[in-house]
Every structure is written in C-alpha cells, then in structure tokens.
Curated annotation (Swiss-Prot), chain A:
Its main location: nucleus. This is Retinoblastoma-binding protein homolog 5. InterPro entries: RBBP5/Swd1, WD40/YVTN_repeat-like_dom_sf, WD40_repeat_dom_sf, WD40_rpt. The lineage of its organism: Eukaryota, Metazoa, Ecdysozoa, Nematoda, Chromadorea. Keywords: Chromatin regulator, Nucleus, Repeat, Transcription, Transcription regulation, WD repeat. It is found in: Nucleus. Required for di- and trimethylation at 'Lys-4' of histone H3. Regulates left/right asymmetry of ASE sensory neurons, via its role as a component of the SET2 complex. Component of the SET2 complex (also known as the SET1/COMPASS complex), which contains at least set-2, swd-2.1, cfp-1, rbbp-5, wdr-5.1, dpy-30 and ash-2. It comes from Caenorhabditis elegans. Disruption phenotype: Strongly reduced di- and trimethylation at 'Lys-4' of histone H3 in embryos and adult germline stem cells. Mutants also display defects in egg laying and fertility with defective germ cell development. RNAi-mediated knockdown disrupts development of the ASE left (ASEL) neuron, causing it to adopt the ASE right (ASER) cell fate.
Swiss-Prot record, chain B:
Disruption phenotype: RNAi-mediated knockdown does not result in detectable defects in histone H3 'Lys-4' di- or tri-methylation in embryos or adults germ cells at 20 or 25 degrees Celsius. Not required for methylation of histone H3 'Lys-4'. Residues 1-35, 58-85, 155-197 are annotated as: Disordered. This is WD repeat-containing protein wdr-5.3. Belongs to the WD repeat WDR5/wds family. Pfam families: Beta-prop_WDR5. The keyword Nucleus does not apply. PANTHER family: WD REPEAT DOMAIN 5B, WD40 REPEAT PROTEIN. SMART domains: WD40 (SM00320). One of its GO terms (biological process) is microtubule organizing center organization. GO terms for molecular function: dynein complex binding; microtubule plus-end binding. Keywords: Repeat, WD repeat. Residues 22-35, 167-177 have a biased composition (Polar residues).
Length: 454, 501
C-alpha cells in the first residue's frame, strides 16, 4: 500500500489516541498481533483470550484458556495456532480457525513467557519464574532445559529469553546483565557476553525485518545490538550499537516494542501511562504519547505494517494512530503540494504552440510499454510475508478460502439475531404501493405477509 | 365589541380619503408580510376570519377596509397610540385584509382543492409509519422517476448521468432482432475475419440458459467455481450450478432492478446493489434475504465484498462510497469519493486497497483501512470510466471507458500500460475481467452483441464470440476452468456459456 504513494504523508509513528478496543467487560493484561496485523489476540486477567479482527475491531473468537491472568501470547508463523501462557502454571495451544484446544502443558511454577519457534510450530520456548528456560516440543512430547554452563556464572538464572528472527538461535538474558546465545537445534551455548551493567535484563525484543536485537534492562537503558557481533563473544563486555533512555525523568520501562523495520523504538513507562518513541539509530526522542494519569502500563505492541500502537493500562486496550493528514495530491494527478516557495524553471517546449518532439516521445513511450512483461497473477513474497528473504514462500502463499496457506483473516459469521425478515410481498401490493414501504401498507390493509412460494 | 369597532372605524374615514395611491402600495406590502409572517396557529384564525368575512360583502365592507390600512404607514407621534390601538385589534386588521384578497380566491378556485389530496395521502401514512418514514418516502419518490422499473445499469449512459432518473432511452434502431441459432455450436470469427468452425483452443457456445424476463445486468462466478450468479433488471438474482448449468436458487427481495452483486469468499452469501437504494445480503443456498442495508440516497450502482468478507463496499449515483460491516449491517464509513456517479468499486487481493471509477473520468485508489485517497488515475482523454478492477495479484488495474477502450494501469506509476480496442462501448457500463486459466486474457462484451477476448501481453484480439443479438454488458470467466458466461440485454435475456476446447 505504501508503494502506491509517491511520498509518505504524515508521520510514520503514532501521534494520537484514536479509540479503545471493546473488551466486553474483560480486563486486558497482554496483547499480540499476528504476522500481518490483521488479527490481534488480547489476554485478560480472568484467563480468557479474545481474538479480534483488527480491520473491523470485532471479536472473532473467545478462548477460555486459563483460570488466572494470561501472561504472554505467541502466534505461530502461519497464524493458525496461538500459544498462551498464564499464571496458573500452564501453557495452552489453540487452533484459531477451528477454535479448539490442541495442547495444554502444566508446569510447577508460574509461566511468564512462551514463544513459538519462528519456523516450527511444534516447538516453543517457555520461561517459568525462578527457573531455567525450557524448550518444549509438543508432538512427540519432549522437554529440554537450557543449562547455563558458562564459566563462573552457573548459578545465574535467565530472566528473559527469545528466539532470533529465523529461529536459528535462542537468546537468553540473565539477572546480572549477561546475554547467552544458544544454538536452537543443539541447545548448546555458542556465545555469551556482558552488557556494561550488572542489572537484570527484563526483556529481549527481536524486530521482524532487521538484524538487531534490543534489550530492556532494569537500569532504564534500552540497548540495541547486532546479532552477528554477539556471536563472536566469549564473555567480553560488549558496547551497545545504539542506546536510548529517558534523560529527564529516568523512567523505567515496563515493556518495549519496535516497528517491524526496527526504525523506531517504543518504551512503555512503568509509572505513568506514557509511551516514549525514539528513532532507533539516532537515539533522539521524537514523541511522547500521554494517556490518562494514574494508569500503569502493562503491555505495548506495534502493528506489523502500520504506524499503530496498542497499549494496555488499567485493563483497557488503547489504540494510538497517525494524525490524519489529508493528501490533496492524491485527488488530482500532477498536483504537488509545496512546503515553501520554489523557483519554477519551465521546460524547453512547455509553452510551445506545437510540440516538435511529440512523435519521438510517443514512439519511445509506446516502445517502453511494449517491453514490459505483464504479470497479473503472481504476488511478490514480500507482499504477504513482510520479508523478502524467506525460504518457504510457496508454502506461505495466502489462499482466499483459507484451505491452504496462512490464516490471514478469520471468517465472519453473520449476526443472525439482527437479520431482518425482509420477505416478499404479493405482486398486487408491491405494484400498487411501490412508493411506500410495503410492509407497513400490507399491515395497514390487513394483508398477511406470505412467505416466498418457492 | 362590534359597536366599538364601528365607532373607531367611522371617524378615521374622513381625514385620510385624499391620499389613495400610497394606500394601495402599503396595502399590498402588508398583505404580503402578513401572509409570510403569520404562523400556523394564526393561519387558523385567519381562515376563520376568512369565512366570517365572506358573509359581510353585502354590508359594504370593502369601502371601510381602506381607511384602517392608511393608519399603519404613518409613524407620527400621534400615531403611536394608534399603533398600540392597532395591536389590540390585530385580528381585526387581518380580517379586513382578507376581503381585499377575496376576488383573487374567487378567481382561482382550483388551487385549494389541489392541496386536499396531498394531506389526505400523507397524514394516514404518517400515522401508520414510524417517525423515520419520511426520508424513505423521499427515497421512494426518487425511484418514482423510473416507472418502467428497469435497472439503471441496463440503460444507456446518455440518459443516466443525471441524478434524476430519465425516461427510457430508445434502443438503437440498427439492432436486428434475429432468433438465436438453433445449432448449439455458434459460428465464431477469428481475428482474420473469416468465419469458420471452432478449432482446438477456441471458445465455443455450449449452452444457452433462459430464466430472466428482462435484461441481464451482471454475471459472476463464485470464487469456488461451483455457482454462477446472474442479476437482472427483473429484480432477481438467479444462481446456477456450474457443473451442468442447472437452476439452483432465486434471490428475490429487491423492489427494483439489480445493478451489481458480489460473492463472499466462501461462496455462501451474495451482496447485491439495486435501484431501490438498498444493499441486501442473501443466503445463496436458502435464498433468504438476511439483511438490508439502507443509507444510500440514490441508485446503488456497484458493490463488492472485501476478500475477508467482513466488509461490503457499495457506491452509486449519490457519489459516495459506503462501507458496511457484514456482521452487524451497520455503515462504518461514508466517503464522498467522486464528483459524478460512481460506476465500479473493487478491492485488491488482500483487502488493503480499494479502487473506484466514475463518470468524471477518474479512477481513485483508496486505503481501505483509513478511507483516505491514495492516488487518482486520469488519462488524457478524460473519458467516463465505467469499470475498474484489480488484477489477481493487486499489481495492475483494468478499466473500461466509454470511448470503446480498455486500459491496463500501473497504479504505482499512475499511467496506462496497455490499451485494448476493437469492441464498441459508447453507452452502457460493461464489465470486463481477466481470465487466467491456460493463458492470460482480457474478456469484455460489446454493444454490438459480440464478446471479445484479448491477449494481455500482446493486446491482440484472440477471438470474437458471436451469438448475442443485443448489447452484452455482463461477462465473467470461471476462476479455474476455461468457461465464459455472458448475458444480453432485452429482448435477448439469455445467458450463454462458452467453453474452450
């Protein structure tokens, strides 16, 4: 969609509060977009999970997943499965289209994080309170513990964990500011390093399209690293490639998210309903979005393809969007909006009565048009995968009827309770009172509304 | 009261007789003012006085009516108590003005009887209908301009560009009414112009379906390929089984002709646009009308489901695009999109972008989520655009113009890439479509009864299908098989199925 525009209008980050999602008396605790941003899952404090069609903002599915607050949500790559983790010591996997429960695994402690393997929906990484992260395989059922066998820090526990963009590595953050990188297949530690702090790493974020990983540390600094740089480390201290923090208030960050390109970083403050947006590579603060006072933020999510942010505070899901800037150039071609006065230099033949080069221009134009190969069928992989370097483009091609490929939308059932009984009337009545509403005239004249004969 | 009135009138009569000319002007202006300014409550009083005044002409009241009007235009200091005096007798003054107007009413007796039937017609309906009845009545009044109840799409563009429905346009006299050939294999003409029997790789007529009693305005295969839907000016949508082209169901709930309809992605529902300013949702299997969406103020000319089948976009002669929520039936968006009636609306393959075309010669591309305009496509000829649709991958736009040309646009560059000519399209809004099984073709009907097949890449006419005797508006190609369906205008009214060998 962006490619159709000649240039971008308005900011590429959210600027104002637009609306709240209708939770129907539920209290939200966390939320997660699917790969395309067409469906959003909201986990509630009563253990339910609401699936929204993000285009119409309607609830498409409701899962009674848990009996305690949902702590984390994760979508599978094709969007057909949803993984939920909860404070009731269990994780659950649902088939989103069918609305059925596929797996439930119970643990001994509260589960704070669960994440699908980016390429394999039969695997997930699970993090429990005060325990080492485990890699779970659902079918057949296998559980493997990620051991911390680095020298001198065997007793440190992981405080956060994440797969990298393609599921090749697992990145774990410890309570003392260390990063451990495991091979996702062999589950052996291949690299480890230190940040320039010994405080706990609270969160690891991996943008969809970039080569970076972002850490949210308890020292209130958000650091950006390049994954390739970390793979060569053996315990050294690594300086962050970029870092952002709140210079004024020294706010702590409850949650951090980025857009899919990794150009912007958004931090959710722990003390106020405030969202800070920085430009990632320059570290400059470009926007602070203020919500209601006194509300504490719980979660924040950036839309995969649009400048939209969902934030959860006080059980309410708020939606922040771009300020609407009217693109007047779109209504008339060759009309261009100017930011300031420009000196106009007319073209060579612009005001000539006769265009001497008209024939040549038309000839060259038609030749250019002839050479183009018109492909009306194939969709480019980046249009439906949001990435251009995927290796399974054919499998992930979306189908209109959802029989194959990813679940890129949820079919909407018609609300039959509100369907009106617009029945057919006798021909004589309809022909006679075409100007009026037939039902009322028929009622007034005492005719019965006969159902359709066929 | 009466003696006092007489006393007050008689002494004023004497001093104001010498000035007759200003009296007439002031009298006329006062009558106009009183007619305009009197509210409804006083109209009853005036009417009562009117009847009372009728009985007094023999007494010579017209003579005495002139003196009291003389008093009002004089703002003298002694006139101030006269004004206060006049306010007290305001009804009396009105009463004395009515006799002056009596000759007019006597001269024009027909107007009063003309108003009575209007009240009789409106008030009983008002009592029967809900408070919101009147806007719908206005909508019905708009439909009244189309007494023949023919779908607006099946009328030529010359008479349909205005917001008010025109009279029926005369059909082209050059059309010769010939009975359809009995031979099931109709003769086909190749690009060389030589009539010959169909060869391998060419389309041939396999079936002729009768079922509609008026012009076929729209034909669409369902996305799964099992059903064929045909909409007509006879207010019905018929659904056919594509395996053997047998009848399946009739969807009949519209009050006026069908202009367009759209299948949902699961081929279970049909959304239809009609002249009766409503958009309806039908269940295809049961034929029941599940929902009626009201909001358009003029003919609804086109409608389309989005690929997710969660929204329905409709547009028409009120120059607005309305987006309806499929689940609830509510109008979630209303976009004033063009400056002339909108002729077509189409979503791209992922539902993020929408394209509309209009008689104003513009094709506009919209962001479906926010409703903002992304781009406007205009060519140098500014011909009215009657149809627009995205290519299956959403990368190109195919449009039909009223200058007998089809164009393939690159919306990114905002310019046409290819032109397809050879058919005739001057009056009607034809449908065009891309056929992708076994080669990429563009298929369109023509106003001379032919159906043309172009190659997308080379722009050459691959085949011309002949068999219809009237203009062919509706054509569609099967999503997976090499089948084309076409429908003709009156008096043809049949659906022809063509299959490639």
């Amino acid at each position: 969609m962006v490619e159709i525009l000649d240039r971008t209008y308005g900011a590429q980050f959210p600027e104002e509060l637009e609306c709240h999602l209708d939770l129907q008396n539920a209290s939200a605790n966390c939320c997660k977009f699917n790969r395309w941003g067409s469906i959003v899952a909201v986990g509630c404090t009563d253990g339910r999970v609401l699936i929204y069609d993000f285009m119409t903002r309607n609830i498409a599915r409701t899962f009674s997943a848990h009996c305690l607050p949902v702590s984390c949500l994760s979508w599978s790559r094709d969007g057909r499965k949803l993984l939920t983790s909860s404070a009731d010591n269990s994780i659950a996997m649902f088939d989103v289209l069918a609305g059925t429960l596929l797996h439930r695994i119970r643990f001994n402690s509260m589960v704070t994080f669960a994440m699908f393997h980016p390429r394999n929906d039969n695997k997930a990484i699970v993090l429990q309170v005060n325990k080492q992260p485990t890699v779970e395989q659902f079918s057949p059922r296998i559980q493997t513990v990620l051991a911390n066998d680095t020298p001198g820090s065997s007793d440190e526990s992981a405080s956060c964990v994440s797969y990298d963009r393609k599921g090749k590595y697992i990145i774990a953050g410890t309570g003392k500011g260390k990063l451990l990188i495991y091979n996702a297949e062999t589950l052996k530690c291949v690299a480890w390093c230190k940040q320039n702090t010994v405080q706990q790493i609270r969160q690891i974020i991996v943008p969809m399209k970039s080569r970076f990983i972002i850490t949210n540390t308890q020292d209130r600094v958000i650091r950006t690293y390049e994954l390739e740089d970390l793979l060569h480390q053996r315990g050294q201290m690594v300086e962050a490639k970029y870092k952002v923090l709140d210079m004024v208030n020294k706010a702590a960050w409850k949650n951090v998210c980025t857009d899919s390109d990794g150009l912007y970083v958004c931090g959710a403050s722990t003390k106020a309903h405030s969202l800070y947006i920085w430009e990632s590579n320059t570290g400059s603060l470009i926007k602070i979005l203020h919500g209601n006072k006194g509300e504490a933020l719980l979660d924040v999510q950036w839309h995969p393809t649009r400048p939209i942010i969902l934030s959860i505070a006080q059980g309410t899901v708020s939606m922040w969007t771009q300020a609407h800037v009217e693109n007047w150039s779109a209504f008339a071609p060759e009309f261009q909006e100017l930011e300031e006065n420009e000196k106009y230099i007319e073209k060579e033949n612009e005001f000539d009565m006769e265009d001497e080069d008209a024939d040549e221009d038309m000839t060259s134009k038609s030749q250019d048009a002839e050479d183009d190969i018109i492909d009306v069928v194939n969709v480019r992989p980046e249009d439906y995968l949001a990435s251009s370097d995927e290796e399974d483009c054919n499998i992930m091609k979306p189908a209109r009827n959802l029989e194959s490929g990813p679940l890129w939308y949820i079919p909407v059932p018609l609300d039959i309770e509100n369907a009106d009984n617009d029945q057919r009337l006798p021909d004589d009545i309809r022909n006679l009172d075409n100007l009026l509403n037939p039902a009322w005239v028929a009622s007034a004249k005492g005719y019965e509304l006969s159902p359709k004969s066929k | 009261m009466n003696p006092e009135r007489q006393e007050t009138i008689s002494p004023k009569n004497v001093p104001f007789q010498p000035v007759p000319t200003p009296n007439q002007q002031s009298l006329q202006s006062r009558m106009l003012e009183s007619n305009q300014a009197v509210p409804d409550a006083f109209q009853k009083v005036a009417a009562w006085n009117h009847y009372n005044a009728v009985a007094t002409p023999p007494i010579g009241v017209p003579q005495t009516a002139r003196p009291p009007s003389n008093q009002s235009p004089h703002p003298n200091p002694p006139g101030y108590p006269y004004q206060s005096h006049q306010q007290q007798f305001h009804p009396l003054a009105i009463a004395f003005q009515q006799p002056f107007g009596l000759p007019q009413q006597v001269i024009y007796p027909p107007p009063p009887p003309g108003f009575t039937p209007h009240r009789v017609q409106v008030s009983p309906v008002g009592l029967l209908g809900p408070p919101g009845f009147f806007p719908q009545f206005a909508g019905s009044t708009t439909s009244q301009g189309n007494p023949s109840e023919v779908s607006v799409r099946t009328k030529s563009a010359e008479g349909t560009t205005g917001p008010i429905a025109p009279s029926i346009t005369t059909k082209p006299t050059s059309t010769i009414q010939v009975a359809p050939p009995r031979d099931p294999v109709a003769p086909t003409t190749s690009s060389s112009g030589i009539t010959k029997k169909p060869e391998n790789g060419e389309f041939s007529l396999v079936k002729t379906i009768s079922g509609h009693t008026k012009s076929v305005s729209v034909i669409k295969f369902s996305y799964c390929g099992k059903y064929l839907g045909t909409g007509s000016a006879d207010k019905q949508i018929k659904v056919w089984n594509t395996v053997d082209m047998t009848y399946l169901q009739t969807l009949a709930s519209h009050q006026l002709g069908i202009n367009d309809f759209s299948w949902s992605s699961n081929s279970q529902f049909i959304a239809s646009a009609s002249d009766d300013t409503t958009v309806k949702i039908f269940d295809v299997i049961s034929g029941a009308c599940l929902r009626t969406m009201r909001g358009h103020t003029n003919y609804v000319f086109c409608c389309s489901f989005n690929p997710q089948s969660s929204l329905i976009a409709s547009a028409g002669f009120d120059e607005t695009v309305r987006v309806w929520d499929f689940k609830t039936g509510l109008c979630v968006k209303c976009i004033p999109a063009h400056s002339d009636p909108i002729t077509s609306i189409s979503y791209n393959h992922d539902g993020n972008t929408m394209a509309t075309s209009s008689y104003d010669g513009c094709i506009r591309v919209w962001d479906a989520a926010s409703g903002s305009c992304l781009k406007t496509l205009v060519d140098t000829d500014h011909a009215p655009v009657t149809f627009v649709c995205f290519s299956p991958n959403g990368k190109y736009l195919l449009s039909a113009q009223l200058d007998s040309s089809l164009k393939l646009w690159d919306p990114k560059k905002a310019k046409p890439l290819k032109y397809y000519n050879g058919h005739k399209n001057k009056k009607y809004c034809l449908f065009a479509n891309m056929s992708v099984p076994l080669g990429k073709h563009i298929i369109s009907g023509s106003e001379d009864g032919r159906i043309l097949v172009w190659s997308i890449q080379t722009k050459q006419i691959v085949q011309i299908l002949e068999g219809h005797t009237t203009p062919v508006l509706a054509t569609d190609s099967h999503p997976t098989l090499n089948i084309i369906a076409s429908g003709g205008l009156e008096p043809d009214n049949v659906i022809r199925i063509w299959r490639r060998n």
